[in-house]
Amino acid sequence: MNMPQLSTIQIGDHELAYLDNKLTSAVTPTIVMLPGWCGDHHSFSELIPQLNDTHRVVAVNWRGHAPVPHDVSDFGYAEQAQDALAILDAIGVDEFLPVSASHGGWALVQLLVDAGPARARAGVVLDWLMRRPTPEFTAALLSLQDPEGWVDSCRALFHTWRPNDSDWVESRVERAKEFGFDMWARSGRVISGAYGEHGTPLEFMKTITPERHIRHLFSTPSDSDYVAPQEAFASENEWFSYALLGGTSHFPHLEMPDRVAAHIVELAKNTYQAGAMR
């Protein structure tokens, strides 16, 4: 099945774009895709077809990102969650399982809070930095806010996220330029601010009341310094789980969409169709 057609809807002062396969025979829940900053529904072009035949799938685009990137007033992850929920309300989505890419995870956690446990019992976060930012990443977030250096900072980040693929990196740099300096600078500010406010995503997840099951799927880093704290957190919090997928990039939904989809389907079955948290 091909990607659904892009639709738009007016939410407040913003025209927001989204995909919806409108599968009427779908099993519960609807799968809702949330991209990272300066990304859009194309981020899920490999993952959506894996789920299209069984689930209703909706992919949300953030304000100012689609159908064509454009300037908007300032916003953060709280507004992203509000926009996503407004779209879901408008198109008649009741129970849903959100899936976020990278730092779309901040919006995913806020969306779980805003939607409540009756509608959103679980979430999947894809390759979200679970520890405090390293000095190098902190510097990169600052560089994104430099009108003279943001493009080079994007290029360096892309090399880190998908090494040994220079053609892909340059294609992403050209795509990055379409979103423009203001949006990339905003991403740096919001991501830095989120870590400053919450410490780590794991600490932010603990603020969800009542708790929801969240699964982290990632491939890198794979060293024990990164994985062990997640293992310890999972042992102390039964609602958190993780899976190390064994890939090489920051994009498991592009690199191994079948494995990501299998985790989504399994979590959906256990937490929605079975009606219990596991």
Swiss-Prot record:
Keywords: Dioxygenase, Oxidoreductase, Plasmid. SUPFAM superfamilies: alpha/beta-Hydrolases. Induction: Up-regulated by PQS. It comes from the Bacteria. GO terms for molecular function: dioxygenase activity. InterPro entries: AB_hydrolase_1 (IPR000073), AB_hydrolase_fold (IPR029058), Carboxylesterase_BioH (IPR050228). Substrate binds at residue 103. It catalyses: 2-heptyl-3-hydroxy-4(1H)-quinolone + O2 = N-octanoylanthranilate + CO + H(+). Pfam families: Abhydrolase_6 (PF12697). Belongs to the AB hydrolase superfamily. PANTHER family: HYDROLASE ALPHA/BETA FOLD FAMILY (PTHR43194), PEROXISOMAL MEMBRANE PROTEIN LPX1 (PTHR43194:SF2). Involved in the degradation of the Pseudomonas aeruginosa quorum sensing signal molecules HHQ (2-heptyl-4-quinolone) and PQS (2-heptyl-3-hydroxy-4-quinolone) to anthranilic acid. Catalyzes the cleavage of PQS to form N-octanoylanthranilic acid and carbon monoxide. This is 2-heptyl-3-hydroxy-4-quinolone dioxygenase AqdC1.
